[in-house]
């Protein structure tokens, strides 16, 4: 008899100031993976670093992850981690830094691993050196709770969807303050991304009694709140989050 699996992080930390959870972690070193400048501009990168330092950790920053992260970026990030030897990998930002951090993690724990094996969904075992925390800055990708990563082969202009329960984050931190900084256009775009994911989940051949209620509720929330979130973003920051 065929069976299904439903993989999500062991912990989902949510609410205002949820970044404070980072101060409770145990370990010696943490690598923060982030994208452009928004997380630094709004102070969340420095706040995450401060919370990790409160936990007694040395912190490495791996920034500049581009939209649609490349194989090259992931390998370079994995090499930097190999030099630093983090106990925790913290992805902070949108889908791109979260997707990149997942594959950097592979190259950190398994240097030289064949990328095409990942494309074939043959992932090596992880968590022998580090665990992964994802902290999203938008509401659209859901990479913080999924087994997916999308990485681009820039030489051949191919985007590869990678899937494995190995890369489901150990912890997702949903701090309301972070996505509340999204401008209206990004709020609209990522809100429709949520709708697309939810509809796909509901009509998927892999849908089941565990996933259907989540998909339907997500669709309902988008219909109820997305217009308000876009048009009244200053007054309804919580809704946008």
What does each of the following model-derived ranges do?
Residues 1-88:
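ATP/NTP phosphate-donor binding region
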Residues 109-209, 213:
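A glycine/threonine-rich phosphate-anchoring loop and its flanking beta-alpha core
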Residues 76-78, 97-110, 145-146:
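Short Gly/Thr/Asp-enriched flexible loops that form oxyanion-binding sites at enzyme active sites
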């Amino acid at each position: 008899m065929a069976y299904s699996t439903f993989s999500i992080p062991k912990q989902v930390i949510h609410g205002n100031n949820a970044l404070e959870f980072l101060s409770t972690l145990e370990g010696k070193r943490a690598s923060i993976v982030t994208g452009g400048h928004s997380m630094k501009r709004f102070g969340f990168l420095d706040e995450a670093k401060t919370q990790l330092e409160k936990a007694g950790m040395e912190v490495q920053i791996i920034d500049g992850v581009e939209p649609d992260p490349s194989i090259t970026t992931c390998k370079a990030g994995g090499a930097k981690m190999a030099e630093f030897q983090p106990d925790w990998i913290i992805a902070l930002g949108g889908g791109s830094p979260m997707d990149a951090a997942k594959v950097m993690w592979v190259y950190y724990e398994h240097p030289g691993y064949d990328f095409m094996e990942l494309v074939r969904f043959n992932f090596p075992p992880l968590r022998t050196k580090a665990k992964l925390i994802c902290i999203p800055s938008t509401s659209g990708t859901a990479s913080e709770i999924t087994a997916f990563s999308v990485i681009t082969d820039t030489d051949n202009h191919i985007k590869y969807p990678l899937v494995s329960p190995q890369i489901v984050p150990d912890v997702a931190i949903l701090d309301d303050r972070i996505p509340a900084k999204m401008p209206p256009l990004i709020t609209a775009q990522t809100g429709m991304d949520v709708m697309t994911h939810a509809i796909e989940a509901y009509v998927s051949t892999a849908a089941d009694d565990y996933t259907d209620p989540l998909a339907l509720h997500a669709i309902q929330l988008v219909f109820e709140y997305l217009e308000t979130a876009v048009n009244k973003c200053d007054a309804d920051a919580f809704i946008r989050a």
